[in-house]
């Protein structure tokens, strides 16, 4: 399954392949698999920039990611909880093969060639 981070206008910011696949996955399971993999990859390298869906504690926004104040392991479960909260608050939405996931419990058929787009929404200033 291919994961793409995109803007609301459709610009692709980052694309990577997700290792965890089952034939049917809920939106919650897709988010969980994505968060687990990106945190695992970051913790293995412990770089300066975390390229993840949600902002870790003690990090600041950087170009296409989050600048970490110090090299430390990120807790994937905490990131997963924050991502689910962000989804429910409409902080982002996801498209599975061009179909929008409406709830965390909605289930989709998943194939190797399935593309999932995560689209982060930017709140309007003053609105």
What are these regions (language model features)?
Residues 1-127:
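Ubiquitin-like/PB1-type beta-grasp interaction modules and other compact soluble beta-rich domains
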């Amino acid at each position: 399954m291919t994961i793409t981070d995109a803007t609301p206008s459709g610009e692709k910011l980052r694309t990577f392949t997700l290792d965890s696949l089952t034939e049917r996955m809920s939106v919650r399971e897709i988010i969980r698999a994505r968060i687990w993999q990106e945190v695992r990859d970051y913790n293995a390298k412990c770089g300066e920039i975390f390229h993840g869906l949600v902002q870790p504690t003690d990090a600041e926004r950087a170009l296409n990611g989050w600048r970490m104040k110090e090299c430390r392991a990120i807790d994937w479960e905490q990131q997963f909880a924050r991502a689910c909260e962000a989804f429910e608050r409409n902080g982002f939405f996801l498209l599975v093969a061009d179909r929008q996931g409406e709830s965390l419990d909605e289930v989709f058929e998943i194939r190797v060639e399935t593309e999932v787009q995560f689209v982060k929404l930017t709140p309007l200033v003053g609105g």
